[in-house]
Amino acid sequence: MSAKKERVVVGLSGGVDSAVSAWLLKQQGHEVVGLFMKNWEDDDDDEYCSSRQDFLDAASVADVIGIEIEHVNFAAEYRDRVFAEFLREYEAGRTPNPDVLCNAEIKFKAFLDHALRLGAGKIATGHYARVRRAPALPGMPDGPLDESSAGALDRARVREAGGRFELLKGLDASKDQSYFLHRLSQAQLARTLFPVGELPKTEVRRIAAEIRLPVAAKKDSTGICFIGERPFREFLNRYLAHAPGPIKDERGRTLGEHVGLSFYTLGQRKGIGIGGVKERGAARGGADHAPWFVARKDRPHNTLYVVQGHDHPWLQSFRLEADDASWIAGTPPAPGALAAKTRYRQADASCVLAPGADGRFRLDFGVPQWAVTPGQSAVLYDGEVCLGGGVIAAAA
């Protein structure tokens, strides 16, 4: 938390976490302004999109707390910086994580730039994460902080603070969102507060109920913001060309037909369309009713490969290679033993980091990792400190 009282623009999403964040900051004496971000044009999607109701909820929260709220449309920025990349990744056969890119490009870039124009000293969101000032490093270079339009200001801020900024996991391990924030830069962290990062979710709900916030009992949002509650395949079908092809098992036996490789992801169990197919002979694990999982996508031959059983060797990887690395400190960690997540909510897995050139790195695991998926993020940790990460390119 910031000891200095200053103007803080809070991203009010219409949910309980951002609402309590705004209230906590006002209690600390900050000048708090709410800002609701509209990141998707939903004019044709009334059945699925909840942004109108979310704004009404955010406005009600602002009224109860006694702060101003501004409505800002970042839909154009979102389409250019996030959604276009999302589609490119799916077209290439990978499974992207748009929430990671949205945080780096919209919630902590477009939002931050807008807040600075409003005279804010900092921004705040309802993410479950923490920011800590690290000890000063001798001869600390200024270079990594040039990534932001506010770079010059933030270099001075970091020098004043006596060191770099670290991104830490939220104290509530079950709600920690540092995985989605691993691409934030020093410039962004220098301007960011996470007021609920020090609290368990149960305490956030208790505070909201105690001060009678209208969203105290509102369910947490789920899914990708621009998809809402609609079936994922239905949504992608509007934007991606697709061609049906064979579904085969590891022996090359055709089991059915897929509707387009882009609609499937590694480790997927539901919606494959071969639920009634049994493995002939003794299946792995001794059960011919073991579920089928997507294991590989052969794009040159437009073939989807599936295997039976959660623990099938095709679903296990001891090594991954990643690219497009982004490091919180601005430079890669030293080679050696760390921990990593290859998907959200996964337990930290011990690994050995081997940094490479041009934003690439390799991770080697002592224990096989399940369904490591190209396009998803591999995020590295040193204890509670999130070091950054990259986009998974391949696994073996």
Curated annotation (Swiss-Prot):
<protein>
    <recommendedName>
        <fullName>tRNA-specific 2-thiouridylase MnmA</fullName>
        <ecNumber>2.8.1.13</ecNumber>
    </recommendedName>
</protein>
<dbReference type="Pfam" id="PF03054">
    <property type="entry name" value="tRNA_Me_trans"/>
</dbReference>
<dbReference type="InterPro" id="IPR014729">
    <property type="entry name" value="Rossmann-like_a/b/a_fold"/>
</dbReference>
<dbReference type="GO" id="GO:0000049">
    <property type="term" value="F:tRNA binding"/>
</dbReference>
<dbReference type="GO" id="GO:0103016">
    <property type="term" value="F:tRNA-uridine 2-sulfurtransferase activity"/>
</dbReference>
<feature type="active site" description="Cysteine persulfide intermediate">
    <location>
        <position position="225"/>
    </location>
</feature>
<dbReference type="GO" id="GO:0005524">
    <property type="term" value="F:ATP binding"/>
</dbReference>
<feature type="region of interest" description="Interaction with tRNA">
    <location>
        <begin position="175"/>
        <end position="177"/>
    </location>
</feature>
<feature type="active site" description="Nucleophile">
    <location>
        <position position="102"/>
    </location>
</feature>
<dbReference type="InterPro" id="IPR046885">
    <property type="entry name" value="MnmA-like_C"/>
</dbReference>
<feature type="region of interest" description="Interaction with target base in tRNA">
    <location>
        <begin position="97"/>
        <end position="99"/>
    </location>
</feature>
<keyword id="KW-0067">ATP-binding</keyword>
<dbReference type="InterPro" id="IPR004506">
    <property type="entry name" value="MnmA-like"/>
</dbReference>
<comment type="similarity">
    <text>Belongs to the MnmA/TRMU family.</text>
</comment>
<dbReference type="InterPro" id="IPR046884">
    <property type="entry name" value="MnmA-like_central"/>
</dbReference>
<feature type="site" description="Interaction with tRNA">
    <location>
        <position position="376"/>
    </location>
</feature>
<feature type="region of interest" description="Interaction with tRNA">
    <location>
        <begin position="343"/>
        <end position="344"/>
    </location>
</feature>
<keyword id="KW-0547">Nucleotide-binding</keyword>
<feature type="binding site">
    <location>
        <position position="126"/>
    </location>
    <ligand>
        <name>ATP</name>
    </ligand>
</feature>
<feature type="binding site">
    <location>
        <begin position="11"/>
        <end position="18"/>
    </location>
    <ligand>
        <name>ATP</name>
    </ligand>
</feature>
<feature type="site" description="Interaction with tRNA">
    <location>
        <position position="127"/>
    </location>
</feature>
<keyword id="KW-0820">tRNA-binding</keyword>
<dbReference type="Pfam" id="PF20259">
    <property type="entry name" value="tRNA_Me_trans_M"/>
</dbReference>
<feature type="disulfide bond" description="Alternate">
    <location>
        <begin position="102"/>
        <end position="225"/>
    </location>
</feature>
<dbReference type="Pfam" id="PF20258">
    <property type="entry name" value="tRNA_Me_trans_C"/>
</dbReference>
<keyword id="KW-0694">RNA-binding</keyword>
<dbReference type="GO" id="GO:0002143">
    <property type="term" value="P:tRNA wobble position uridine thiolation"/>
</dbReference>
<comment type="function">
    <text>Catalyzes the 2-thiolation of uridine at the wobble position (U34) of tRNA, leading to the formation of s(2)U34.</text>
</comment>
<keyword id="KW-0819">tRNA processing</keyword>
<keyword id="KW-0963">Cytoplasm</keyword>
<dbReference type="GO" id="GO:0005737">
    <property type="term" value="C:cytoplasm"/>
</dbReference>
<keyword id="KW-0808">Transferase</keyword>
<dbReference type="InterPro" id="IPR023382">
    <property type="entry name" value="MnmA-like_central_sf"/>
</dbReference>
<feature type="binding site">
    <location>
        <position position="37"/>
    </location>
    <ligand>
        <name>ATP</name>
    </ligand>
</feature>
<keyword id="KW-1015">Disulfide bond</keyword>
